[in-house]
Each structure stands twice: as C-alpha cells, then as structure tokens.
Amino acid sequence: MSEKQAHTRVIQGKVISQAGNKSIVILVERKVVHSKYRKIVKRFKKYTIHDENQSAKIGDVVSAIECKPISKTKAFRFKEIITAGVEL
C-alpha cells in the first residue's frame, strides 16, 4: 500500500481564486524546452483543488497532492501553504 502512495503527484502553484465552497483554483507554472527553437518557454495550467478547511487565501503559494477524483474537475487535495500571500 505504501508503494502505491509513493507515486502520487505533488503540484505547487499560486491560488488565483476561490471556486466555491471548499474549492480553490491554483495556477501551476512549468518550464519546457521548445522542440523547434530550443528556447525555454513557460507553460501554465489551472487546477481545481479540494480545500477541506478553507485555509488557503488568494495569493498564497500552496502544494497539493493527487487523490481519487472528488468531482468532475477536482482530483487534487490541499496539502500545505508554502508561502502566505499579501492581503490587499
């Protein structure tokens, strides 16, 4: 059982919105090498994360762990706040 849990993905991104009750949307940035031009380019993807305690705020940098699908769009759970964002 522990071997199976070792393969779960952990993603890290910035909270950009609160998508309802117990849900947040994070923006994950990754850098890839362009196949033709060999330049490093940024790629962005939004993930909907399940936040049970509603502890993450907009602007926080958080990590999330992969889990079984919770809903149509949610397949990650909130893990921890890495850096607290600035409140305006």
Curated annotation (Swiss-Prot):
Disulfide bonds listed in the record: none
Matching InterPro entries: NA-bd_OB-fold, Ribosomal_uS17, Ribosomal_uS17_bact/chlr, Ribosomal_uS17_CS
Keyword flag NAD: no
GO cellular component: cytosolic small ribosomal subunit
Statement: the UniProt record of this protein carries the keyword Secreted: no
SUPFAM superfamilies registered for this protein in UniProt: Nucleic acid-binding proteins (SSF50249)
MF terms in GO: rRNA binding; structural constituent of ribosome
UniProtKB keywords: Ribonucleoprotein, Ribosomal protein, RNA-binding, rRNA-binding
GO biological processes: translation
Entries under PROSITE patterns matching the protein: RIBOSOMAL_S17
Highest taxon above the source species: Bacteria
Described function: One of the primary rRNA binding proteins, it binds specifically to the 5'-end of 16S ribosomal RNA.
Family: Belongs to the universal ribosomal protein uS17 family.
Assembly description: Part of the 30S ribosomal subunit.
UniProt-recorded name of the protein: Small ribosomal subunit protein uS17
Gene transcribed to yield this protein: rpsQ
